[in-house]
C-alpha cells in the first residue's frame, strides 16, 4: 500500500512539474512559431503552427537584421557581457581572497560593505547613476563595464569569500616558501581551486548582463550604442506601429544564445553555489 502511495505521489509530482514546465516553455514556443509567419497572420492565428499560406521563411529574421541593425546590437551586447564578466571575475575573486586572508578592521569593513550593497535597491540609485554616468563619460560600453562591476561586486565577493575559507592555508604557505609572490600564488594556486565558483558566478552574471535592459537604457548613449534588449524595444514604430514578425525573430535571436549557454552550464551553478555558501 505504501509503495502504491509513493508511486501515485511520484506520478502526481511529475505531472505537476510537467504542466509547470509547459507553462514556462509555451511563450517561447509561441514566439518561435510566429517568427516564421507572415505579419498579417501573427495576430489572426497566434497559436497555430506556420502552414503553407502563413509561412514566411526567414524573411522576418532578415528584416530584423538588415532593417533594424540587430547584428550591431548583438555585437555590443557580446562585448559588454564578456568584458563585464571577465572584469567581475578577476577583481572580485582577488578582493575576496584579500578580505579572507588579511584580517584587519579595513577588510572586515570592506566585507560588510559588499554584503550591504546586495540589499540596496537599484531603483534607489538609478537616476543619480544615469546623471553621474553622463557627467563622467561612463555612458559607453567600456564605462558600463565598470558600473556592472560595482553592482555585482557584493554578491560575487560574498560567494568567493565562502569558497576561499574552505581552501587550506597551508597550500598557499607552501607556495610562498617555494618563492612564489602573493600575486603568483593567487593565479597559480588559488585560482585553479576556485574554478567551481568562477563558473557559477560567470554563468549567473552572463545571464543577467545579456538580458539586462534598464541599466544600459539609463547609462548608454543610445545614439551610438544599443544592446540587443534596447534594439528590440526600438523596433516599435511611431503611433504604436509594430512589425511583429521582425520582433518575434529578434526575440528568438536574443534568447537562443543564453538558453544554449545555460543548458550547457547549468550543473555548475549548483556546484558553485554549494561550494561558495555551504563550505563557508
Pin down the residues of each PLM region.
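A hydrophobic, multi-pass inner-membrane permease signature
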Residues: 1-280
